[in-house]
Amino acid sequence: MDQNINNVPAIEQVSINKIFGIPAGAQEILIAGRTAPAPYTPAIDPYYKFEMGHLRDVIAWLKVGMGEGLFLTGPTGAGKSSLVLQVAARLNLEVFNVTAHERLEFSDLVGQFVVKNGNMEYQYGPLALAMKRGGVFLLDEIDALPPGTNVGLNGAAEGRVLVIPENGGEVIKPHPEFRFAATGNTRGSGDDTGRYSGTIKQNLAFLDRFWCLEVGYLSKQKEEAILESVLPVPEMKGLIPKFLEVAEEVRRLFQSSDFTTQINTTISTRSLIRWVRLTHVFLSMAKRGCQPVYYALDRAILNKAAPEEKAAVKEIVQRIFGISEPEK
């Protein structure tokens, strides 16, 4: 990571009305941002569609200031990280993104000494850089965070100074625009469904430092608009409602509390786009006895699933599309 904090473009007040296309006539709202990307600004996904309620909440969180973390919870593939990344991308804010795991230590986030050109040099980690540069620290899969590490993050979530004893007692005073966001599938309360192995019940005092925003899958209307933008070809237009219906049914079973019908496979917006794109790519194979919808489905989603999961999803596809998979 670039350790230079002198190359950070200045943060100024920008209008969210213009950036996010809020209709004319609405009260103009200004928020901290930039007019051009900075080194760690995420790329804009031109096909991304915001749910206005989620966008409103993230904007409100950014405006509130330091000392209030944002915890986004929801099912796998709902777009929790993407929501933060795409808001930041349009505001040209920097994001320092880390995925938690059971071996993650506080020093991995703050920094450590490394050998550079034969000398020992202190290398700042993503948390320290976010605090110095006024970026968003985004900690994904917080449910997997070891208890000792989340205790170390209490101060950062509240916007307190960070002391680094290993670097001569350096004190980092957080930039006024530093923000701390986290994502997780289990609300930090542990997993009793068996879907999210490796998750750990999080410290209640740590979670108390965060707003909680529940993020579900995009609405069918939003996903339809995305698919039509990604693949605006006549031969696919009539099939898009069926792809969406399959995704909706698979997600319903994934989130079901009925263990007799529940499945452990879901379809994210990302994988839905992949499935539709691959189906279009493989359309020409239909003349050779290959069914492109099933062929693409395996490669986009189901080759990662257990055999019984594949069978369950393909039954849904057969019912909705009205086509059978050719025997192999």
Give names to the regions the model predicted:
Residues M1-K328:
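C-terminal regulatory/interaction module of P-loop NTP-utilizing enzymes
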